[in-house]
């Protein structure tokens, strides 16, 4: 076996994040040639990636990041909480998140093809991380949105590991001429509302038709045999309760249940002398897509 230079061993491990044992094996096989050792580690990473590709990856992190008018929310999965909490895994997830935001990707595929700061594509970097952590790693979801008008995109992360990584991520787009710093607070409040109360639509008009029809059908069955005027009032009351449960603007405000979200926004409009519209939101809960 060729004698291994300890400095090269440390350097290779730091550069690739691979374990010392694998770096030592690679350097030995490469007869001390660092360039060849890097190639061997990449080949090892690919082999391990193929081997582990069918293993379930349901842990990991959800990341959310905004550059102002553009934001990204993604989920990077691994197999265990042990790896999800690993600082190097989180640093890798953060680098993917930042690259996706900077490149304004529009899909998982675009994100996988995006280069990281060193020039390596996310897809290839994931293969290397599989070799490092010996777990299957998958970029399972990536959604982005850009505010084209005046306004911004705010994000909120719950059960945080870091500022941008956690177990739940929310992104909210608001359109307004209000001061950006003021609007940022509004967007965060709305994001917390979305995370806490899980609405299915921003307003009544955007409730999925099949869901609304299903509710109406259920209420109609419940009032069968009652006078039309009575049935109409009962259905109206039930729909009102339903809207308060599933429609963002109709929900009681999480931080102040005496007000609805709609009233909160109205108050903020008066405070800023500017109209504020919530135009989009997305929420990712770790593992829900598995």
Swiss-Prot record:
Keywords: Cytoplasm, Elongation factor, Protein biosynthesis
Family annotation (PROSITE patterns): EF_TS_2
Pfam families cross-referenced by the UniProt entry: EF_TS (PF00889)
Compartments it resides in: Cytoplasm
GO MF annotations, alphabetized: translation elongation factor activity
One GO cellular component, as annotated: cytoplasm
InterPro entries registered for this protein in UniProt: EF-Ts_dimer_sf, Transl_elong_EFTs/EF1B, Transl_elong_EFTs/EF1B_dimer, Transl_elong_Ts_CS, UBA-like_sf
This protein's record includes keyword Transport: no
Keyword Protein biosynthesis: yes
Region (Involved in Mg(2+) ion dislocation from EF-Tu): 80-83
Sequence similarity: Belongs to the EF-Ts family.
Role noted for this protein: Associates with the EF-Tu.GDP complex and induces the exchange of GDP to GTP. It remains bound to the aminoacyl-tRNA.EF-Tu.GTP complex up to the GTP hydrolysis stage on the ribosome.
Protein name: Elongation factor Ts
């Amino acid at each position: 076996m060729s004698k291994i230079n300890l400095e090269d061993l440390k350097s290779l491990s730091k550069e690739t994040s691979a374990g010392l044992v694998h770096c030592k094996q690679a350097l030995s096989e490469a007869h001390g040639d660092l360039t060849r050792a890097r190639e061997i580690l990449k080949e090892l990473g690919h082999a391990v990636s193929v081997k582990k590709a069918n293993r379930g990856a349901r842990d990991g992190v959800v990341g959310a990041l905004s550059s102002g008018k553009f934001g990204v929310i993604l989920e990077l999965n691994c197999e265990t909480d042990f790896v999800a909490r690993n600082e190097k895994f989180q640093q890798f997830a953060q680098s993917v998140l930042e690259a996706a935001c900077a490149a304004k990707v529009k899909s998982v595929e675009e994100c996988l093809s995006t280069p990281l700061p060193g020039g390596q594509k996310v897809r290839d970097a994931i293969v290397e991380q599989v070799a490092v952590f010996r777990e299957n790693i998958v970029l399972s979801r990536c959604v982005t949105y850009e505010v084209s008008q005046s306004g911004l995109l705010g994000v909120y992360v719950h059960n945080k590991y870091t500022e941008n990584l956690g177990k739940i991520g929310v992104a909210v787009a608001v359109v307004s001429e209000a001061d950006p710093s003021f609007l940022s607070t509004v967007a965060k409040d709305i994001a917390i509302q979305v995370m806490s109360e899980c609405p299915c639509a921003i307003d009544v008009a955007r409730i999925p038709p099949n869901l609304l029809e299903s509710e109406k059908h259920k209420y109609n069955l419940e009032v069968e045999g009652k006078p039309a005027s009575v049935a109409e009032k009962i259905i109206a009351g039930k729909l009102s309760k339903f809207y308060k449960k599933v429609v963002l603007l109709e929900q009681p405000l999480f931080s102040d249940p005496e007000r609805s979200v709609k009233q909160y926004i109205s108050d903020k409009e008066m405070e800023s002398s500017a109209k504020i519209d919530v135009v989009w939101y997305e929420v990712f809960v770790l593992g829900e897509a598995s």
